[in-house]
């Protein structure tokens, strides 16, 4: 019961990796930027909840600047992981950014994060790119929604689903996007 479980980037019990581990821990801390919704974690011992923050990575970076020793900071790999979270949630600093977002990114650069290496984390294979392109091409407009209903895509290309949905949101006049596909052959 002395174990601390730190839940990051979600407030919902249904989205944690292991509900069993969460329930067995004596103490729970939540760090999240999403609005509190249904099924949230009840009675956490510590909450860092900022719905106006760009990402959970931004919040973690801010916390790291105020805790521990000056020598106890993230290494390059950890800093690059946090920077990748900021880049992902802000779509390369184009959405939901503020001064705090850029300050967090600057701190991560001071910790050794290299933007070129972080960008490489987002490189896709030809299979993933082709799957995304096909899903975007299949999209049809209904009111202000882009809807793409695909056939089946390979499990190794499942990242293309979210990428296609994000790309569709960048089209002028699109307020929402939906992408539905069968992943793999298991039914």
Question: Which residue ranges define each predicted feature?
Answer:
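A generic local secondary-structure boundary/capping motif
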Residues: 17-20, 47-50, 72, 136-137, ...
């Amino acid at each position: 019961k002395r174990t601390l479980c730190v839940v990051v980037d979600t407030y919902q019990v249904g989205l944690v990796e292991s509900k069993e581990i969460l329930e067995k821990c004596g103490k729970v801390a939540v760090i999240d930027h999403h609005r509190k919704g249904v099924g949230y974690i009840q009675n956490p011992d510590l909450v860092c909840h900022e719905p106006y923050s760009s990402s959970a990575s931004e919040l973690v970076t801010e916390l790291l600047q105020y805790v521990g020793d000056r020598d106890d900071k993230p290494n390059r790999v950890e800093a690059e992981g946090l920077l990748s979270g900021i880049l992902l949630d802000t779509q390369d600093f184009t959405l939901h950014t503020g001064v705090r977002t850029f300050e967090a990114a600057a701190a991560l650069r001071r910790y050794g994060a290299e933007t070129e290496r972080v960008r490489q984390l987002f490189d896709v294979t030809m299979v993933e790119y082709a799957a995304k392109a096909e899903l975007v091409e299949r999209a049809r407009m209904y009111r202000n929604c882009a809807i793409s209903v695909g056939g089946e895509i390979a499990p190794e290309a499942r990242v293309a689903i979210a990428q296609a949905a994000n790309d569709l949101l960048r089209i002028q006049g699109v307020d929402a996007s939906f992408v539905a596909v069968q992943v793999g052959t298991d039914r």
